[in-house]
Amino acid sequence: MIQNMAYRKLQVIRISFHNWEDFFSIINKYPEKGADKMKQFKIIATAASGMEALVGKELRDLGIECQVENGKAIFHGDIETIATANLWLRTADRIKIVVGEFKAVTFDELFEKTKALPWEDILPMDAEFPVAGKSLKSTLFSISDCQAITKKAIVSRLSEVYHRYGRLPESGAKFPLEVALLKDHVTITLDTTGPSLFKRGYRLEKGGAPLKENMAAALVMLTSWRKDRPFYDPVCGSGTICIEAALMGHNIAPGFNREFLCEEWDWVDAAIFEKVRTEADAKADYDIKLDIMGSDIDGKMIQVAQRNAEEIGLGDSIVFKQMQLKDFTTEKEYGVIVANPPYGERLGEEEAVQQLYREMGETYRPLKTWSKYILTSDLTFETHYKARATKKRKLYNGALRTDLFQYWGTRPPRAPRVEKTEE
């Protein structure tokens, strides 16, 4: 009797299929939880212009070989590699899987080559898969048409594989895709990250012109700072630069307190992310004492910065203080100053900002052992600071071109070499 009931249930489930062969083909093709469908992937870590080399260095420090190109670093690996990159990369924007690459100069070619990709290995029948697009120097220049044709090709493939004769439900997990054309070369990618990597989850509030967390991390990484030396941000705002420095000082993975989109996918084993997070927690040095200070003339922003630091558990690692920039004095040596002052882009602000630059020069030039790094879009900064930078580096703060003016301090003396004596 039980067998007859089970058979009748299968008959009901099978109604939407033409025959038993179709039904069992779906059962066999649907991606399973933790299934090893695409063990090795070609992966892209996207980055803002000017930050690609930093992303490449981060990957190599993680033991991942990569190739750095404009706006991205390319590498290969499995799901654990993807989890590691999402969790640990401080300066990247997103981690994407390359689903396919090919040349296309006609819409028919784009359709057929997209349809030929093994979409059933990635997208379950109920997957929600929005398709973004971009095109540069390509025959197929209409982005909306490229998006529509790519979507149509994927739907056609999945409808055949899953034997669907109506619309795909798209009611399940989200799989954001992008079709990108560059000089007729098509790259289709799948985003594993979700909200951009700069969203660490600690910024409860922000100031008027906030610096993204990955940009703040890049500024710290471009300095000579080491965790045993003083670190100071004189215009700290909501505290982002100081918090990113503290995360590095404690060796805390920037993505430790957030989740990633691919964790919702059936073919991504939750145990892999749990393993990577456990290993990251073991690598963190929560007990080290750091000398990090942030100040701002706005007392309300100091309160915001303190709350943000406390949100991520770093309230005791950073000292925030309301203070005018010109009031900073110190007897400490070999510290690092990182500042992202107002740029004076708005009408009427230019003179006030230039006065701030002059105060920076008067306050910081006497600190011969300290290294100073100031980010601004004002290319005349050196004139107001009254000193030529040791080095300048072009960076993009969003779409805005900025320069990091670097003033290197004297190097600390080397520790005396201890000669080994023979016993």
State each model region's role.
Residues 18-37:
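Short, Lys/Arg-enriched N-terminal segments with co-localized hydrophobic residues
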Residues 136-139, 196, 342-346:
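A short, flexible beta-alpha/helix-coil linker loop
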Residues 41-51, 55, 77, 81-84, ...:
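S-adenosyl-L-methionine
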Residues 211-329, 345-346, 350-352:
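Conserved S-adenosyl-L-methionine
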Residues 324-423:
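C-terminal catalytic and target-recognition region of SAM-dependent MTase-like enzymes
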Residues 39-173, 423:
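Non-catalytic nucleic-acid substrate-recognition regions in nucleic-acid-modifying enzymes
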